[in-house]
Regions:
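N-terminal Sec-pathway targeting helices
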Residues: 2-20, 26-31
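Active-site recognition of the HExxH zinc-binding catalytic motif
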Residues: 56, 154-174, 195-199, 254, ...
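Catalytic zinc-binding patch centered on the HExxH motif and its immediate surroundings
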Residues: 79-97, 115-140
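Pan-zinc metallopeptidase signature
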Residues: 230-352
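Mature extracellular/luminal domains of secreted and GPI-anchored eukaryotic proteins, especially small
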Residues: 232, 416-480
Length: 480
């Protein structure tokens, strides 16, 4: 299906720009989190940090294996100057983001000029915090006078989260493994595990707050969240969703694993039974527990006359977003659940950035759903994109080109990403409420198969979300 024209390249970008945005720009944005050599010293802690470190060790059953330096800075501006060591996007990041932007326009994720490198920088540097981990310096910086200072509930909670990340990194070498991750899915899985475990421990810790502490914590967390959201309103919604996908999915996955019968389930997930992709994390019972393997896929060839730029992987969330450009988010999610693997290339041809992709489905029925969504997506692309869709058994093929920053085209709204990410949130909520991952997964999958994400927020007057969840829950009890 390769085409010798510029439209060919944009086609591949359609499917993989999601992973592209999350990995190409995202990896730069996460560049501060890199592997580092841990000093070989017996861990010791300041007086106001020691109880938090012990709590992390007791909760995770992971022991700190190396000393962690702690630096106290009470002055807000000095603290900010200390932890903000970022001169903005590098020349390489800016160059890569120009290609990423073109691929995203081809795929219909955004139009115009979204300035992805600047957006990644803004997401990373926005928001107030009283705790920062500087891994390359082997130090945690705390906004407080000294080790005798009384820490606020939110700062103690953030320290618990950061200390969990550090302990897991020391024990499982997560930073080094993420740095060496061969595919975007490998990277996102490890990031999701790390962040998901840290947030799980944070939730356990904050649940111990008394009423006064809990009220102060909620108010501070809400205030910081609003400040962050206000600061990043200019960032494209689809790009923002790409940046939080692994965190959202990982948090639900970790919650489910901690409820499993095997008390070592998290240890296995970090080591001998690492999820193959985030689709296994979205369905920890059926896709992870039953080990849904990745299908084999070969990257498309660069068409004659094209200049190769890079190869990426879209992943199930990327495929979902792609399909949501042509069919309702409910249908896009059901189709994306049949993702088996994918590979796409970005290249330049006749002065334009294009992309070709191969998406392998789990089976024929899944391929039928993905094909339907891709054809609907192609029909919405501007004529200048020259979008093509093909099929070879259970492998779907697509080719599309950047229509240009001035091209008018439909783009994704929040409903597309919400359908995927909110399902993970519902899974986490049900696991917390019922303690039963099998039942919880059944409820989450069926609710978002039958309903739009907005239904859970009461946007549809014909749907009572609580009654719907209860009804689905009764059905699931009898079927799982």
């Amino acid at each position: 299906m390769a085409r010798l024209t510029a439209r060919r390249r944009a086609s591949v970008a359609v499917a993989l720009v999601v992973a592209l945005g999350a990995l190409s720009v995202g990896a730069w944005a996460l560049g501060e989190w890199k592997p580092f050599a841990h000093p070989s010293a017996e861990p010791s802690w300041p007086a106001n940090i020691a109880p938090l470190a012990r709590y992390v060790e007791d909760t995770t059953r992971v022991r700190f294996s190396a000393h962690v330096n702690v630096e106290f800075i009470a002055d807000a501006q000095r603290f900010l100057d200390r932890v903000t060591n970022d001169d903005g996007p590098s020349a390489a990041a800016l160059a890569n983001s120009a290609t990423d932007e073109a691929v995203g326009r081809a795929l219909g994720f955004w139009s115009g000029e979204p300035h992805l490198a600047d957006s990644a920088h803004l997401l990373r540097t926005s928001g107030d915090t009283g705790v920062e981990w500087l891994p390359e310096e082997h130090v945690v910086v705390v906004r407080a006078k000294d080790e005798k200072a009384e820490l606020s509930p939110i700062d103690r909670a953030d320290l618990v989260m950061v200390l969990t990340e550090i302990a897991d990194d020391q024990h499982y070498q997560l930073n080094e493994r993420m740095d060496r991750a061969p595919t975007p899915q490998d990277f996102q899985v490890l990031a999701g595990l790390a962040i998901g475990e840290a947030l799980w421990v944070l939730d356990r810790y904050t649940s111990r707050f008394d009423n006064d502490e809990a009220e102060v914590y909620r108010a501070d967390r809400s205030s910081r969240g609003k400040e962050f959201n206000d600061a990043v309103t200019s960032v494209n919604l689809t790009f923002r969703s790409l940046r939080v996908a692994s965190q959202t999915v990982g948090t639900a996955f970790v919650a489910a694993l901690h409820r499993s019968s095997d008390g070592r389930a998290m240890q296995h997930a970090f080591t001998s039974a690492v999820p193959a992709a985030i689709d296994q994390m979205t369905m920890p019972v059926h896709k992870y527990g039953q080990r849904d393997p990745l299908e084999h896929v070969e990257p498309p060839a660069v068409p004659a006359g094209g200049e190769y730029l890079y190869t990426r992987q879209m992943g199930p969330f990327g495929v979902h977003l792609l399909l949501a450009g042509g069919v309702p988010p409910r249908d896009a999610l059901e189709a994306a659940d049949g993702w088996g693997n994918d590979s796409f290339i970005a290249y330049q041809l006749e002065g334009r950035v294009c992309t070709d992709a191969r998406i392998v489905a789990d089976d024929k029925a899944a391929a039928d759903r993905i094909e339907h969504g891709l054809k609907a997506w192609a029909a919405t692309r501007p004529a200048a994109s020259q979008a093509l869709v093909g099929r070879d058994d259970t492998t779907l093929l697509l080719s599309v080109c950047d229509p240009g920053a001035k091209a008018a085209q439909p783009t994704l709204d929040a409903a597309a990403s919400d359908q995927f990410l909110d399902r993970a949130d519902l899974l986490r909520d049900r696991v917390s409420a019922t303690g039963q991952p099998v039942l919880s997964e059944c409820i989450a999958v069926r609710f978002y198969r039958d309903h739009a994400a907005a239904d859970l927020r009461g946007a549809n007057p014909d749907v009572n979300p609580f009654e719907a969840i209860d009804t689905i829950g009764y059905d699931c009890v009898s079927s799982v």
